UniProtKB/Swiss-Prot annotation:
S-adenosyl-L-methionine binds at residues 197, 217, 226. Belongs to the class IV-like SAM-binding methyltransferase superfamily. RNA methyltransferase TrmH family. RlmB subfamily. Specifically methylates the ribose of guanosine 2251 in 23S rRNA. GO terms for cellular component: cytosol. The lineage of its organism: Bacteria, Pseudomonadati, Pseudomonadota, Betaproteobacteria, Neisseriales. It is found in: Cytoplasm. It holds the Pfam family SpoU_methylase. This is 23S rRNA (guanosine-2'-O-)-methyltransferase RlmB. It catalyses: guanosine(2251) in 23S rRNA + S-adenosyl-L-methionine = 2'-O-methylguanosine(2251) in 23S rRNA + S-adenosyl-L-homocysteine + H(+). InterPro entries: 23S_rRNA_MeTrfase_RlmB, Alpha/beta_knot_MTases, Ribosomal_eL30-like_sf, rRNA_MeTrfase_TrmH, SpoU_MeTrfase, SpoU_subst-bd, tRNA_m1G_MTases_N. Keywords: Cytoplasm, Methyltransferase, rRNA processing, S-adenosyl-L-methionine, Transferase.
Length: 250
């Protein structure tokens, strides 16, 4: 089936079992495994009427292409994973916090960004279809379950999407070494969409032009840049910190 993709490891499989079990086509469990985590997966799969097959380690290694699978591999129907941005925005109980990835094509970076986004309570991660890694087994593994919990939305025209976000009252904040404000000295808006470019080229020109603010992250050492997931974690954490302070003063 063209829309199927594998996921592997307990974090990814368990997250999918609890968040979107109907998207799971089948599971493969390593023969002889009977630990508590495996029993939990088997019990949940049985409750959801998901097909389970038992296979030897060589078979699972072949399916996961040598990646660490922990004895559990699943196949999901990716067509049942589609989320509309409008639905996300219209069903929030707090001001939106979004992460936009412009040109992040490495699956390890995408997975790390999704994990960071989940930790910081990001409501959706957005990326252009033509300049993104796309969800795959590597992304799911690195994300440690976050690829199954954080909506990942790819769009055909990122510039148009940025304009649409502004119509919802969301500020578009770009990260840039030459930004006109630094992260620790700017009053961040309640509704925010942070844009991260890739480590080599940064944001594309048109993306930059749609930003309401350009913010730099202060650097105190000798390196000139950080991994995109680290940068994302810093700006998202600062956004959450400022929200907490505002709520305490309200």
């Amino acid at each position: 089936m063209a829309n199927q993709r594998p996921i592997y490891g307990f974090h990814a499989v368990n997250a999918r079992l609890w968040q979107n079990p109907k998207s799971i086509v089948e599971l493969y469990i390593q023969e002889g495994k009977s630990d508590a985590r495996t029993r939990e997966v088997l019990e949940k799969a049985a409750n959801e009427n998901i097909r389970v097959y038992f296979a030897d380690a060589d078979r699972l290694n072949a399916i996961s292409k040598g990646a660490r699978h922990q004895g559990v591999v699943g196949f999901i129907d990716a067509s049942k994973n589609h989320v509309h941005l409008e639905d996300v925005l219209e069903n929030l109980s707090e001001p939106p916090l979004l992460l936009i990835l412009d040109g992040i094509t490495d699956p390890h970076n995408l997975g790390a960004c999704l994990r960071t986004a989940d930790a910081m309570g990001v409501h959706a991660v957005i990326a252009p279809k033509d300049k993104s890694a796309g969800l795959n087994a590597t992304v799911s593994k690195v994300a440690s379950g976050a690829a199954e919990t954080v909506p990942y939305i790819t769009v055909t025209n990122l510039a148009r999407t940025l304009r649409e976000l502004k119509e919802y009252g969301i500020w578009i904040i770009g990260t840039d070494m030459g930004g006109n404000a630094d992260l620790y000295h700017c009053d961040l808006p309640d509704s925010a969409a942070w844009v991260m470019g890739n480590e080599g080229d940064g944001m594309r020109r048109l993306t930059r032009e749609h930003c309401d603010m350009l913010v730099s992250i202060p650097m105190f050492g000798t390196v000139e840049s950080m991994n995109v997931s680290v940068s994302a974690g810093m700006v998202l954490s600062e956004t959450r910190r400022q929200r907490v302070l505002k709520n305490e003063k309200a």
